[in-house]
């Protein structure tokens, strides 16, 4: 690195000062070549870095030399600078060659990492030859491996096929050797299927039977749940009908009772009035007639007719009215006794009147009509 940096510095100085002599330029070129040509012990892995730095550092001064070869501000090209271009050409060739060798060396160094090989340019070609031989050997080995691997592929595919075919053949042989067992195995499967079908068929009727049983149970439950309500409703209806009948009967009985009561109340009054009318007439001696009992009989039916207008409706009404009439007659007798102070007996009076009429007929021989006389 020391000579390369000094050469670069000198080249830079020469570009700055165009008045440098040709001898100095030649010396700088020789020094740069000697720097590149000197063998240095270095590792193969480090060659890329060192040579890369050399290339990077060597290229800028060449460009600067090119710039120095361009026309100056005065427009005159110095004659001393022309041989520099010629001298620079072999330098470029050397740098290009070194760059090409350096480009090949880093790849080889990456392929094989080994101990550092000290030596110059003479050692490098031998190492390169060895590396090439080793690379060719590895490539040949890899090709052989590929060539061996390629036939293995179909063979490997064929082996599973052969194994499958062998298995199938073994199975076929077993089947042929034991056809009875195969036949027995098949019916077993069929019998199992039949059994399962039979079991399923039995389960289905059981399910249907269960449904049939459930339906009557539901019906009975519904009937049991509904029957009390229905019975209660029917009983309630019957009781309501009975109540209605009772109400109607009560209504029918009420008018009958009302009819009885006014009739009972009216008949005694009529009887009382008839009796009152009859009694004064009977008391008068001039108005007494032998037909008195007949009149009484005629009057009494008139009073009874008012009470017996509806004998079909109620038969008991007649007896009840007769009892009341008797009671009223007794009351009238008591009233008459209270007024006159004497006890009046209608029966005795009627007998006396009849006897008096008979005596008159015997005397005169004629019937005396009291009514006509009056």
Swiss-Prot record:
List UniProt keywords, sorted A-Z.
Phosphoprotein
Positions with biased composition (Polar residues): 16-26
Output the lineage of the source organism. Answer: Eukaryota, Metazoa, Chordata, Craniata, Vertebrata
Q: What is this protein called?
A: Glutamate-rich protein 5
- In which residue ranges is the amino acid composition biased (Basic and acidic residues)? 44-59, 120-134, 328-359
Give the organism the record lists. Answer: Homo sapiens (Human)
Q: Could you tell me which residues belong to the region Disordered?
A: 1-168, 241-299, 328-374
Which residues carry the post-translational modification Phosphoserine, per the record? 169
Q: Which InterPro entries did the record assign?
A: Glu-rich_5
């Amino acid at each position: 690195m020391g000579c390369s940096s000094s050469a670069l510095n000198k080249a830079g100085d020469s570009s700055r000062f165009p008045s440098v002599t040709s001898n100095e330029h030649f010396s700088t070129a020789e020094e740069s070549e000697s720097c590149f040509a000197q063998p240095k012990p270095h590792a193969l892995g480090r060659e890329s870095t060192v040579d890369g730095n050399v290339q990077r550092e060597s290229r800028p001064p060449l460009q600067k030399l090119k710039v120095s070869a361009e026309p100056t501000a005065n427009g005159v090209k110095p004659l001393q600078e022309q041989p520099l271009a010629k001298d620079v050409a072999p330098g470029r060739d050397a740098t290009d060659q070194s760059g090409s060798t350096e480009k090949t060396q880093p790849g080889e160094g990456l392929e094989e990492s080994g101990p550092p090989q000290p030596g110059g340019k003479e050692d490098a070609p031998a190492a390169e030859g060895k590396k090439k031989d080793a690379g060719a050997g590895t490539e040949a080995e890899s090709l052989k491996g590929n060539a061996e691997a390629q036939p293995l592929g179909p063979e490997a595919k064929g082996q599973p096929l052969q194994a499958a075919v062998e298995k199938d053949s073994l199975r076929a042989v077993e089947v042929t050797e034991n056809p009875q067992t195969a036949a027995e195995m098949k019916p077993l499967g069929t019998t199992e299927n039949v059994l399962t079908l039979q079991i399923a068929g039995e389960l289905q009727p059981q399910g249907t039977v269960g449904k049939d049983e459930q339906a009557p149970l539901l019906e009975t439950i519904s009937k049991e749940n509904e029957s009390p309500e229905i019975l209660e409703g029917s009983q309630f209806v019957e009781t309501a009908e009975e109540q209605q009948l009772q109400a109607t009967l009560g209504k029918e009985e009420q008018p009958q009772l009302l009819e009885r009561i006014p009739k009972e109340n009216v008949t005694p009054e009529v009887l009382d009035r008839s009796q009152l009318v009859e009694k004064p007439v009977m008391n008068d001696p001039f108005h007494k007639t032998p037909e008195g009992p007949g009149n009484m009989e005629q009057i009494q039916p008139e009073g009874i007719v008012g009470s017996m207008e509806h004998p079909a409706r109620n038969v008991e009404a007649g007896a009840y009215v007769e009892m009341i009439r008797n009671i009223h007659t007794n009351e009238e007798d008591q009233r008459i006794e209270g007024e006159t102070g004497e006890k009046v007996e209608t029966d005795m009076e009627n007998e006396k009147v009849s006897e008096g009429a008979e005596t008159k007929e015997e005397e005169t021989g004629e019937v005396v009509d009291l009514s006509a006389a009056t």
